[in-house]
Curated annotation (Swiss-Prot):
<keyword id="KW-0460">Magnesium</keyword>
<dbReference type="GO" id="GO:0046872">
    <property type="term" value="F:metal ion binding"/>
</dbReference>
<protein>
    <recommendedName>
        <fullName>UPF0292 protein PF1724</fullName>
    </recommendedName>
</protein>
<feature type="binding site">
    <location>
        <position position="69"/>
    </location>
    <ligand>
        <name>Mg(2+) 2</name>
    </ligand>
</feature>
<feature type="binding site">
    <location>
        <position position="26"/>
    </location>
    <ligand>
        <name>Mg(2+) 1</name>
    </ligand>
</feature>
<keyword id="KW-0479">Metal-binding</keyword>
<feature type="binding site">
    <location>
        <position position="69"/>
    </location>
    <ligand>
        <name>Mg(2+) 1</name>
    </ligand>
</feature>
<dbReference type="InterPro" id="IPR022972">
    <property type="entry name" value="UPF0292"/>
</dbReference>
<dbReference type="Pfam" id="PF01751">
    <property type="entry name" value="Toprim"/>
</dbReference>
<feature type="domain" description="Toprim">
    <location>
        <begin position="20"/>
        <end position="103"/>
    </location>
</feature>
<comment type="similarity">
    <text>Belongs to the UPF0292 family.</text>
</comment>
<feature type="binding site">
    <location>
        <position position="71"/>
    </location>
    <ligand>
        <name>Mg(2+) 2</name>
    </ligand>
</feature>
<dbReference type="InterPro" id="IPR006171">
    <property type="entry name" value="TOPRIM_dom"/>
</dbReference>
<dbReference type="InterPro" id="IPR034141">
    <property type="entry name" value="TOPRIM_RNase_M5-like"/>
</dbReference>
């Protein structure tokens, strides 16, 4: 990842930390990764309930962010969730698209974001010897 993409990645991570709605992820490792990144908002896991149940719970919030993995299954889940939620609440798919564009070569999904962030932070922003 190039330094300019790292800066974009950092801005997305900051947006995740500041997000006030509910975030939908696929599983526990995805949630754990987001928590390590400092995300404190409510997170719903698809592994805990049916797609329809998660969509129903999410629709009770003013804004929903869909963060499924970047593989084919994640794409299909994101589309199905969007179709269920659009018109019921504000749905953020853009953050997932941005993450996919910037990080998909280095991360297969949401569960990899913390490790990617940590390695990039050390690579691009670690103090140089003598500082």
């Amino acid at each position: 990842m190039y330094p300019e993409n790292y800066e974009k990645f950092e801005k997305i991570i900051e947006r995740l930390r500041e997000f006030k709605g509910v975030i939908i992820v696929e599983g526990k490792r995805d949630e754990d990764s987001l928590r390590k990144l400092g995300v404190q908002t409510e997170i719903l896991r698809l592994s805990r309930s049916s797609l329809a149940d998660v969509a129903l719970l999410a629709s009770e919030h003013e804004e929903v962010m869909i963060l499924t993995d970047f593989d084919e299954t994640g794409e299909k889940l994101a589309k199905r969730l969007y179709d269920l939620l659009v018109g019921l609440t504000k749905v953020d798919m853009e953050t997932r698209r941005e993450l996919q564009f910037i990080a998909s070569k280095d991360a297969k999904g949401i569960e990899d974001l913390y490790d990617l962030w940590e390695s990039l932070r050390l690579r691009f922003w670690a103090p140089k010897e003598g500082d």
